[in-house]
């Protein structure tokens, strides 16, 4: 069952305010995945590591000169169909939220699962993302 929209609005807004496009439907996901160039998809979540590390780390990394052509998010536990459709694009990767996936021309080139977000700080995660942006974007 999805979370209350009132509960998660601040969690959505934290990314949207940084320019991240929300993918609310399977069609939104499919349209994004057809785009050429580099794409970062954030699997957003209500958990503490999303609040303390993932969202702040993404926001910090997006200030880098080099960044993906497209940046979007799905919200696990809320936008169930969109999240399932996104996960169908990475079938060999177990579901993980929060998580981050970087694609280049539709091919997954970098993935950060929850266990590589937990226990870190936002600066460390941002540094990892900036390294990937510098390499692939």
Name each model feature, range by range.
Residues 31-65:
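Local sequence-structure signature of Cys/Sec-based thiol-disulfide redox active-site neighborhoods
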Residues 51-56, 83-84, 122-123:
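Conserved strand-to-helix beginnings and helix N-cap segments that scaffold or border functional pockets
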Residues 83-97:
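Short acidic (Asp/Glu) patches
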Residues 1-37, 136-137:
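N-terminal leader/targeting and pre-domain segments
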Residues 43, 66-85:
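Thiol-based oxidoreductase modules, predominantly thioredoxin-like and allied folds used
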Residues 24, 73-75, 102:
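Structural signal for conserved beta-strand scaffold positions within catalytic alpha/beta enzyme cores
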Residues 7, 11-14, 59-68:
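Short helix-loop-beta junction
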Residues 94-137:
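Non-catalytic, surface beta->alpha helical segment in thiol-disulfide oxidoreductase systems
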């Amino acid at each position: 069952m999805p979370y209350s929209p009132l509960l998660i609005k601040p969690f959505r807004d934290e990314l949207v305010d940084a320019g991240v496009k929300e993918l609310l439907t399977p069609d939104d996901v499919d349209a994004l995945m057809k785009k050429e160039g580099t794409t970062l998809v954030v699997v957003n979540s209500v958990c503490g590591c999303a609040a303390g590390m993932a969202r702040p780390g993404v926001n910090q990394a997006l200030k880098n000169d080099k960044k993906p052509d497209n940046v979007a998010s799905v919200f696990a536990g809320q936008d169930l169909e969109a999240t399932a459709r996104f996960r169908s694009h990475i079938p060999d990767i177990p579901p993980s939220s929060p998580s981050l996936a970087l694609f280049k021309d539709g091919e997954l080139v970098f993935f950060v699962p929850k266990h590589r977000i937990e226990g870190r700080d936002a600066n460390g995660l941002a540094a990892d993302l900036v390294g990937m942006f510098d390499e692939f974007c």
